[in-house]
Structures are given as C-alpha cells and as structure tokens.
Amino acid sequence: MIWNGRLVLACVLLIAGCSGQVDAARTREQRKAFGSPNIVLPPGPAHEVASAKPARALGEKTFTLRHVYHHGTHNYPNLHRYIDIQPESKLQVSYDDGTTYEEAEVAFKAKAQSRIVQRMAHRSHSDIDAVQVHYFTYGQPADVEWTEDEIAGPNISDKSTVLTFAKMAANAYIFSRKDGEWQPVKGGFNYTDDFGWEQDGLRGHIFADEANSTVVIGLKGTSPAIFDGADTTGNDKLNDNLFGSCCCAQGGPFTWKKVCDCAGSSAYTCNNTCLVKSLREKGHYYWAVKDLYRNVTERYPDSEVWLSGHSLGGVVSSLLGLTYGLPTLTFEAFPDAMAASRLGLPTPPGYKIGSHQARPMTGIHHFGHTADPIYMGSCNGGTSFCSIGGYAFEGVCHTGETCTYDTVRDLGWRVGIGTHKIVSVIKDVIKVYDQPPSCEQDVECVDCYNWKYFENNGTETTTSKASTATSTTTRTRTETCKTPGWWGCLDESTTSAPTTSTSTSSSTSSTRTCETPGWFGCKDETTTTSSSSSISSPSATPAPTITTTSSLPTSTSTSTCKTPGWFGCYDESTTTSATPKPSSTARTVTKTKTTTSDDDDCTSREWFGLICVDPSPTTASGSSPSSTNLPTTRRKMCTKRHWYGTCKQWRFDDFDPKNDL
C-alpha cells in the first residue's frame, strides 16, 4: 500500500515537472498569445531615424576595476561606502557565488559602437527627482522635453564584448587589508563596529577605461540560496517580489513571501496606490542604485556610463538605464516592465506610463536563454523551485529588447532553475555559441492580464447593511425496521413533512435482560420498550395540524446456539410472531430461535460463546458397569473450522462396548 502511494506521488510530480518545463520554454509566439490585440503603437520617426543612422564601430576599450561601492538598504539605509582598488592589487574573484575562487583578470576588453537612445533632454539628478515626485503626487507624467541622442555603447553583436559584460555582472571579489579600507562616502555614518553590513544592501563594481571616458557599473544580483539567511537573500527576495509579482506576492501559492498588503477583497484585484507606495520606500534597491549612480557620476562627471547586471542586479540596472537613458546589458534578468510602470519612469510623448516594453531606442538589451524559467517569465507554478523558495515571478514582459539563446532547441537542454546561474551562462552558453543572438522587442506583451487594479487615496468609505433571516423547520418521522444492518436499518422507510412553529417532546423507557452476551451485543436480547410522543402547534399562527403515532415493538426472544460464529450464530433459525392491535400504540413480537444442526451438548461457554468449558463427556447411565452394561465412549472430532482456527462443526464417533476379557 505504501509502495503504491509513492508510485502515485512520483507520477504526479513527474507530470507537474513536465508541464512546468513545457511552459517555461515558451517561444515568442506563445508569449504573444497573452497579449492584447487592441494595442496600437504610437506614430513617430524612431525607426526611420534608427535606420537612417546605422551603428558605427568606435574601436575597442580596455577596462580595469577601480572601485567597489556598497549602499545599504534595509538594516543600514544610510550606509554608503567605497573601497579603491590599487593597480598593483592582486585580487581573487568568484563567478559561482563564492564556491570557488580564481585569480582576477586585470583588464577587460570590450568593443564600442554608436547607437541612438531616446531620453529626456534634462537628466540631472534634480530633474529626475522632480519628474518622479510629480508622478507620485498627481498620478500623471510630467510634461518634459525629450531628445534622440547618438551615443557610444557596447557592441551587442560582438561575442567578446558580451562575455566581458557578463563577467562584470558576475564578479565577487575578496579584499584584504593590503588592498585598502572601506571608506564612507561624503563622511557618512560610521559603521565600523557593526557586523553584517556587508550582507545588507547593493554592491556595484566600478570599471573605467584608460582615459576615464567610459565607466561601467556592474551590479551584484540575487544570492543563490533559496531560503533566507544566506548572504543578501532575504533582502533580494523582498525586492524580487516587489518588482516581479502582480501584487506583492499575494494571490498565489502560500510559499510566496508576501511583501505588502495591497490585495483587494476579491480574487485577482489589487490596490495600485498601495503598490506604488510600497515601491517608493527608501530602503528598496531602486533608490539605493540611484544614490550609488549619483556618487559615481560626481566622481566621473564627464564620463559616459554603461551598466551591467545579472538577475535582480540586471533588473535594477535596466530601471536605472530607463531613468537616465544609459546603455545597459543584463543577463538572465526576470521581466522588468511591470516594475518600470509602477515606479512611474518617464516615457516619451505618445507613450503612456506602463508601456515601456513597446518603446524603441531605449538602449536596454536583456541576454538570456530558453532553459532559464526565471528569464522566460514562467517560474511561478505551485511546484516550481521559485515558488517553493518564496519567489513570486509573475511578469512576462521585458523593457527594451531581448536577446535569447535557444539552448532548449540548439543544445537539447532541459528547463531548470540551475541554468540561471551566471557561471553557467558564461561557460556553457556565451562561450559555446559562435555569435550572440539577435535582439528583438515584444511590443504586444501584457503583464498580469487577469488582474484588476484600482486606485485608493484613503478617503473612500464603505457602508455595508446586514440582513437577518429566521426560519424554523420541524421534521416528523415514522420508522419501522425489519432488517437491521451493520450501521443502521437496511429497509428504512421514512416519511417527513416540514412545518413551522412546531414543538415535539418524547419519552422512552427501556428494560433489558441478557442471558447470552455476544461479541458486539446480546444474542438473546429481550427488550420491553414504551415510547410516547406529542406534537403541538400554537394557535397564534395558523398552521396545519400534524399528529404522529409512533410505536416501538415489545419482543420476547429465546435463543439456543450450538455453532457460534465470529459475529453471530451460524445455525440460527428465527420464528417471529406479532399481534398487531390497531387501537394500541405498541405491538408485541415473540421471537423463538430453534437450532437444527449437528449435536452440540455444550452447556457452559466462555470467551463470548466461542470456547466450551464443559467437562469431558461421561456415561449418562446411573447403573453400575457390568458385562452387559458397559459405559459408552464417545470421541469428539472437528470436521470444519473457521478461518481464524476455531472449530465450526463437530463430529462424535460412538464405539461399541467391549466385554472384559
């Protein structure tokens, strides 16, 4: 039985796993099936300008690690530190989240090319802050001036460049006292005596070329541990569920880590005002990366800034790139269009806030492969590892363009969360393919299509009226049972009629005498029972008058059983007589049990009638033995047994008397 249960469980898990794999490796056409056919793209010269000015090669740049910035978020929101990396420092780096370390590369080479990016004309930090405050205050985008600039960016069609940016997004360095000390930015708070600050916050690695004309910020992504407590997993999970779920990880499996209370009273409804307020809290990664970017640009005011990130670091990088119009390359980032919409990131004329997936010329490029369910936007089933670990990845739409390696078709990979790690992407994907994949937009993509969002400014009042209903039902029932069964009467017949305002009272008296107790009750039960019942209806309320006469039998039973069984007598025959009296409320039943089976002269039994304790048979004659009158010897033998071993039928063999020699 246990083996069968395990087999069924294995089959269920196999089916669930197969279904999750098929859904995770969705093609672009399958993802478009969830889109809205009513989306109309706004007119504009974007594509014409882009085609009129093809990308130009701008040579190769060599980057070196210059600084590492760390910005606190939850436990230390005011912490902002940096450490300068000296040119002679020999560092160790890990590409698999601290499992193994190797000598860090000294230089990173990447090719540059020109591209056109559509962004705001005025992008100072104060200008960006004013635009976002306007949206959060009035719920409408601010009227600002936009421009299309030709800038330098990484060459996304070059394999070595893509590989370099993946390494910048993946690295985690080990520092020693010889490499320098962590210094507070702008003389900030001193956290020297606090332990654990390095596990709280966002870390960015700053790379610069020889002329300091271009700076690359590589942001650290989500820690790989499923459960809280390892590295920055707890804080990363909170931001993942804020950015990637439809409503703060509510309305899904119970394992999801809920990060706010914005769900509506009905299913698939969410308070958008509450949702935006949760994202605006100072401790979240978007605001931390804005402060980090502000300090880097103050240190390199005349440099172009490029961004790179993996997983959550890639999402934060793309949000920063959309805000300031910066070239960005991300790796295995989960869909980020939903987060950009809720943060109120500015959009050019002709686009409403929330349509970032339909915008061209953003400068955002997301690299990933089809075997990663997080990147594909399908790691959200109840049995998926993301849901088991508490992550709620419900979005399916990326901003900008997606550049997808089809590892399921080309390499025969199976879909699994283990392929999400950046070390797997670097060694098994980017280095294996000869060229990077082509990049494209998914303009018809729609997030959370089955959810309804409503606005709430906190002034609405809700009035509810309670209604009460009173009903009284009385059931009158007459029963006569002739064939009692194991759990009740087998031939039960019932008549019932509902009435209103009816009261019923009854009294019963019983006398029982048992001579032969059985396994589950008395075998020769003799019972005398009298019962009376009355029903009355008040005269205040007109109602039908119902009179019920109930009579219970008075029975007399005599039983003699020679072959008792496990649950009763096997040789029982019953004769029942009853004398009905129409004018009486009771009837008398006489039951006589006669046994007609093989002789069994047992007169004393124990153990519920199963064991005979009579002495061995002896002669019944009262005369003394003589040569003509000898005692009779009888041999008792069992001819048929029960399934549990006791004798069911006996046989007695008589022997002729023998004369004394």
From Swiss-Prot:
Residues 493-513, 527-559, 574-595 have a biased composition (Low complexity). GO terms for cellular component: multivesicular body membrane; vacuolar lumen. Keywords: Autophagy, Endosome, Glycoprotein, Hydrolase, Lipid degradation, Lipid metabolism, Membrane, Signal-anchor, Transmembrane, Transmembrane helix. Residues 25-661 are lumenal. GO terms for biological process: multivesicular body membrane disassembly; neutral lipid catabolic process; phosphatidylserine catabolic process; piecemeal microautophagy of the nucleus. GO terms for molecular function: phospholipase activity; triacylglycerol lipase activity. Residues 1-3 are cytoplasmic. It catalyses: a triacylglycerol + H2O = a diacylglycerol + a fatty acid + H(+). InterPro entries: AB_hydrolase_fold, ATG15_Lipase, Fungal_lipase-type. The active site is at residue 311. Residues 492-559, 574-597 are annotated as: Disordered. Glycans are attached at residues 155, 190, 212, 271, 295, 457. The keyword NADP does not apply. The chain crosses the membrane at residues 4-24. It comes from the Eukaryota. Lipase which is essential for lysis of subvacuolar cytoplasm to vacuole targeted bodies and intravacuolar autophagic bodies. Involved in the lysis of intravacuolar multivesicular body (MVB) vesicles. The intravacuolar membrane disintegration by ATG15 is critical to life span extension. Belongs to the AB hydrolase superfamily. Lipase family. Binds to both phosphatidylinositol (PI) and phosphatidylinositol 3,5-bisphosphate (PIP2). This is Putative lipase ATG15. It comes from Passalora fulva.
